[in-house]
Amino acid sequence: KIFKRFASLLTIFILTIMSIVPVHASENTSVVNVTDDLAIQMAERFAKGIVHIGNIVANNPRKFYDTTGQAIGYIVNYNLENKPYGYVVFDTTCESLISEYSFGNNSANPYEVIYQSEANVFSEKANTSEIYKIAPFEYGIVDNLGKIRTNYGETLEKTVLSLNESRGKDPATWDEVLLDIDEVYENYTLVSTNHLQEFISFNEPYIESVTGHYACAVSALLACGAYYNAVDYTDIAGDYMDIWDSTGTTVSSESGGITYGSTTIGNIGPGFVDFCAGKNVSVTQNTDYSPNYNFFTNCIDRGDIAVVHCGIISSDTGERAGHSMAAEGYATLRAYNSGNTVHTLMVFDGWGDTVRYLNFDFDSWTDISGTTFNG
């Protein structure tokens, strides 16, 4: 069995990857999108340069993610004469681009180690579950109970993941989970509802024009701040950037002169409380990483505002896209055609000015969490 890590692989792998992926000039900002097929091709070339054994076949590439839900690499298996014969882990966070590899009849990759040792706590869908890199050489899968099982035999709380990180660019696929008000009137009957007396919004073009910045969580909190009379309408830019700073929002990209930001969910509630305190407004917060519908309706019913954070798999990129929105009401709807009931949150979506209805029952959320305020 051969097992080595990091340094010895650097030269070999650089030569391997250069033979597969074209090298761009430094001023070219193009990003190579590594596909399953390319991961297999990379793995096979790597194996041929290391093992010098014929008939090794790479297969079953499995994408893995960092703790924020961003794809960072692949685990690829090897077969020799139709029998398992090791694996390689490509990891873009490692300098060598390979974090580990192993060849041999008894080599099990991190995913297999977890699933084989803890099979009784995983659902039937576990074989398609996402695997997360928790630490160097440690990986985890979320089990039936919402716990993370790792290849080191540890059981961790799901809160070690920050999958709810909110990113501030508008993916087109959000139209699938957000209903416009005219669509609601046309296709649904209202079962029950409650909402704040005033709908507050600051559309994205306006925010970008006055601040040169945009982050969905910051825009959502600006609406919350306005609701609690903590916003100075003569200095929207100043308040926006104060919220940006108090929540630890970081730059995720820049485009067209606009700086886009990313905010970790765990910072949103406390950061907003600090912002309000600076305005002599007393507000408390509660963040739930697995809220039910009542978590939001109870907040609205007592006359407070909330922020919903959710993630989907973008049909454009195949990757998770996250978004945070101010929840200013709720509505249970019944579809005219099917009679199905839909639970929605009435949200300021961060992009436009009008209320939209977020389908809380959407069955393909990658994650959904919330922050409620009391003030």
Describe the function of each predicted region.
Residues 40, 44-59, 64, 104-131, ...:
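Active-site-adjacent structural segments surrounding the nucleophilic cysteine of cysteine proteases
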Residues 72-79, 138-143:
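Short beta-strand elements that form the blades of beta-propeller/WD-repeat-like
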Residues 223, 251-333, 337-340:
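Predominantly the structural core of cysteine protease catalytic domains
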Residues 69-76, 300-308, 342-346:
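Short, hydrophobic/aromatic-rich segments at coil-to-beta transitions
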Residues 8-19:
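Bacterial N-terminal signal peptides
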Residues 17-31:
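Sec-dependent signal peptide cleavage junction
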Residues 124-127, 132-133, 144, 292-294, ...:
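Active-site signature of cysteine proteases
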Residues 33, 78, 82-124, 295:
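Long, charged/polar, surface-exposed segments that mediate recognition or autoinhibition
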